[in-house]
Amino acid sequence: MTILFLTMVISYFGCMKAAPMKEANVHGQGNLAYPAVRTHGTLESVNGPRAGSRGLTTTSLADTFEHVIEELLDEDQKVRPNEENHKDADLYTSRVMLSSQVPLEPPLLFLLEEYKNYLDAANMSMRVRRHSDPARRGELSVCDSISEWVTAADKKTAVDMSGGTVTVLEKVPVSKGQLKQYFYETKCNPMGYTKEGCRGIDKRHWNSQCRTTQSYVRALTMDSKKRIGWRFIRIDTSCVCTLTIKRGR
């Protein structure tokens, strides 16, 4: 499982040319180039030009990516909006990638969460693991959702943290050219079995509906005054069930 996870991370970094790490000015204009952009990119960039020829052990790979992961998590904490100034700070999430091609995997933090769950269960007996498997217990999601990478060409516009409508720029200038902005969106599946209501809800007593909810991510945008800068914008990030009680019965 460890080797599989590392393989997924390697492929993830292979397609990623750059990733936004810091927010110089949430609402401000700032530089077009994202501040402190890091390219962890390939094994060569992490371990030196001869890394590919001399090979790496599983242990050294694990140590390297553990260090990268710690940096990502530390930076993620630094760029979160001040909760005193932003009521929706708890809705912040990172689902943006700058790349020259469509990413092949979900965001890295999603893979980390799955790997963490695996590590938490690593010491359990086979019997416990077998009974804890959601598929074996017949667990189903209350609402059916779909997740996919979309580009700024698909989004066009978005709402920022001040409530204004901004234009989402499709490409971001970097030192060696331009990269596209990709957003990993999750929304309710219009073709799913829960389009008429949430799964498992007693319809005799409750009205239910699956709704797409949004969170904030950082993106390069342009406001109505043609000012370009990095801002927090809303994108679709989950599908939740809302309930209202039936009255008059």
Curated annotation (Swiss-Prot):
Site (Cleavage): 59-60
Main location: secreted
GO molecular function, one term: neurotrophin TRKB receptor binding
One GO term describing the cellular component: glutamatergic synapse
Gene3D superfamilies given in the database record: Cystine-knot cytokines (2.10.90.10)
Signal peptide: 1-18
Localization annotation: Secreted
Positions annotated as glycosylated: 123
Keyword Metal-binding: no
Propeptide residue span(s): 19-130
GO BP terms in the entry: axon extension; axon guidance; axon target recognition; behavioral fear response; behavioral response to cocaine; cell surface receptor protein tyrosine kinase signaling pathway; cellular response to nerve growth factor stimulus; cellular response to norepinephrine stimulus
Post-translational modification, as annotated: Mature BDNF is produced by proteolytic removal of the propeptide, catalyzed by a FURIN family member. In addition, the precursor form is proteolytically cleaved within the propeptide, but this is not an obligatory intermediate for the production of mature BDNF. Can be converted into mature BDNF by plasmin (PLG).
InterPro entries: Brain-der_neurotrophic_factor, Cystine-knot_cytokine, Nerve_growth_factor-like, Nerve_growth_factor-rel, Nerve_growth_factor_CS
Keyword Signal: yes
SS bond list: 143-210, 188-239, 198-241
Annotated keywords: Cleavage on pair of basic residues, Disulfide bond, Glycoprotein, Growth factor, Secreted, Signal
UniProt record similarity statement: Belongs to the NGF-beta family.
Role played: Important signaling molecule that activates signaling cascades downstream of NTRK2. During development, promotes the survival and differentiation of selected neuronal populations of the peripheral and central nervous systems. Participates in axonal growth, pathfinding and in the modulation of dendritic growth and morphology. Major regulator of synaptic transmission and plasticity at adult synapses in many regions of the CNS.
Assembly mode: Monomers and homodimers. Binds to NTRK2/TRKB. Can form heterodimers with other neurotrophin family members, such as NTF3 and NTF4 (in vitro), but the physiological relevance of this is not clear. BDNF precursor form: interacts with the heterodimer formed by NGFR and SORCS2. Mature BDNF has much lower affinity for the heterodimer formed by NGFR and SORCS2.
PANTHER family named in the record: BRAIN-DERIVED NEUROTROPHIC FACTOR, NERVE GROWTH FACTOR NGF -RELATED
Protein name: Neurotrophic factor BDNF precursor form
Gene from which this protein is expressed: Bdnf
